[in-house]
Amino acid sequence: KLCKSRNQLLSSYPSSIKEIRFYTNLDKGFRHSSSVLYFAALLYWGIGNFFTRAPRLLSPLQINKEESLINTSNSIGGIEYSDAYLYDNDARFVFNFIDSALENNCKAVNYVESLGSKQDKKGDWLTKLRNNRSNDEFEIRSKIIINACGPYVDQQNQLSNQKTEHHHVFSKGIHLVVPRLNKNERVLTFFADDGRMFFAIPMGGRTMIGTTDTHVSTPETE
């Protein structure tokens, strides 16, 4: 489902969501061979209906030639595969999405909190809202509700007595922003000695290096 959703987003927002290549180097001692990861990448490509460019199996010589930044002295090879990314950033994408909705007679409001929803006998949704500036509460009726609360999706479902099969798991990490490391528009991927994955993501004239691998119970930061 995630791959199909990604493909739909790539087709619907070609100027905002684009395909990008992930370039993965593997060192000696890694728990899997490059061939195993290559077949996993082929499976991922197939699950996505072969919508993106095909994965590649890389030799240390190829990696050294195509990305000389990578130290291949201990390399056993690697893989390259495709996924998607937001060309600008998530904030701009959301703003443009809301702006487009407003042009089609949508009503967008700030500082209004959903206190939960319930269905009436006709199947309509009644949602209780609170104006967090005046503390006034009111109710609206709708045919459909789309829960787009991001990390607070589960919390909103609880308020509305909605049960789902899947739930969010939260994680945090650290990201370092440094001057651009590589000229190619691809994400460099590395595995630490303990198996953690690190990304070096191109962002304009900068590269963002990091990982999010520490599980937390809530989305709020300290």
Where are these regions (language model features)?
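Active-site substrate-recognition segment that forms the wall
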Residues: S16-E19, G116, E139-K143, N147-E222
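Dinucleotide-binding Rossmann-like beta1-alpha1 core, especially the glycine-rich loop
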Residues: K1-E67
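A structured beta-alpha segment of the ubiquitous adenosine-cofactor-binding alpha/beta core
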Residues: S114, K128-E139
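Internal alpha-helical scaffold of NAD(P)-dependent oxidoreductase catalytic cores
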Residues: Q8-L10, R92-N96, K163
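A conserved short coil-to-beta-strand element within the FAD-binding core of flavoproteins
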Residues: N110-L126
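Helix-loop-beta segment of a Rossmann-like dinucleotide-binding subdomain
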Residues: N64-N104, L126, E139-I140, T212-T221
